[in-house]
Amino acid sequence: MNDTVAGVIAKALARHGVEIIFGQSNPSALMLAAEDIGIRQILFRTENAGGVMADGYSRITNKISVIAVQNGPAATLAVAPMAEAIKASIPMLVLVQDVPTHARDRNGFQEFDHLALFASVSKWTRTIDDPARVDDYVDLAMMVANGGRPGPVVLLLPKNVLDLEAHPAKLPRTANLGSFPLDRPRPCAQAVAKAAGLIAMARAPVVIAGGGVHVSGAVQALVRLSDRAHLPVATTNMGKGAIDETAALSLGVVANITGRSGPAFYTRDLIADADVVLLIGNRTNENGTEGWSLTKPDAIYIHIDIDPCEIGRNYEAVRLLGDARAALDDLTIALEGLDLASRAAARPALEARIA
């Protein structure tokens, strides 16, 4: 006998490395099927709390988190943590029990337009209503959530469809797509060479690292680049921790705390003096740039990001489109072939100024 749709979803989640689901026992058919194969449920009291739990789990494990919620009012409570996750580039799979297909568009119990509800906080929202395509949709959800710039996705699960017999896949699937970054694309070699040349020739270059450094797992790559090219590193609030804040070349957290009464006021001049600014996984948002006033308008910008729409959004830049860790590794290698004597000579005075 074939599995039910709920059973196939549970097995697909397990194949992608899912070990826990944050939930409240809904959808019941799915939660029972998941329990049967060893996927644990971690309970939450409210969906907004469950979403925060899921977000934290993803950040710690570099695996997609899964949260299951009921339709309607319960689903609305998942919006706030999803909004945080999509801005912070954190993958999350939200499974929403929906009204049965025969009740759709008939004012079924707690029926809600979930496509409209999640439009601004989900990378991708789909309904599983074809028992022959369950694996397709679970795999697509994983690819969209963990691929490119990670973020939340939603699968809507009509209650009656979960109990239907699912058609077996024609070929067994073995791919595990449940961790991120799913891929590590590298930037164009010519752009990397150009960026390396600009850094080598710069009078006062600076790095401003954003949250993308953490998402990419690029902390060590950033440390290597900073040490090799003698680059001072500041971070945004989301990038905090990307470099040891007691390190000799660390400028700490900057952005909206560099005002006259802010704790980072005394690093402001170092940022403002930069002639080359390397942005890494940095959305250059208002808070992260103190209203786009932190750096000189005529500075040269180099921007590493996985999202092509973020590069050049606020500052025209040399485009290093790709995974942050891969890009930093390539940039460090490119710099090894260049003369960095002037950067090395300037380092003692720079460290003294930072101290």
Label every model-predicted segment.
Residues M1-P27, M31, A132-R133, L156-A248, ...:
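Cofactor-pocket helix-loop regions in the catalytic cores of large enzyme subunits
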Residues M1-T4, A132, D298-A355:
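Phosphate/pyrophosphate-binding active-site segments
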Residues N2, E19-I20, R59-V96, A119-P172, ...:
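Structural signature of the thiamine diphosphate
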Residues Q24-N26, I42-V52, I67-A74, D129-P131, ...:
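Active-site nucleophile and cofactor-binding loops and adjacent substrate-binding regions
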Residues N26-S28, Q70-A74, D98-V99, K159-V161, ...:
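Short glycine-rich anion-binding loops that position phosphate/pyrophosphate groups of nucleotides
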Residues I37-A68, W124-R126, A248-L270:
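Glycine-rich oxoanion-binding loops at beta->alpha junctions
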Residues G56, V99-S120, E245-S250, Y315:
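Active-site-proximal loop->helix
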Residues R59, G211-I302:
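Glycine-rich, anion-gripping cofactor-binding loops and their flanking helix/strand elements
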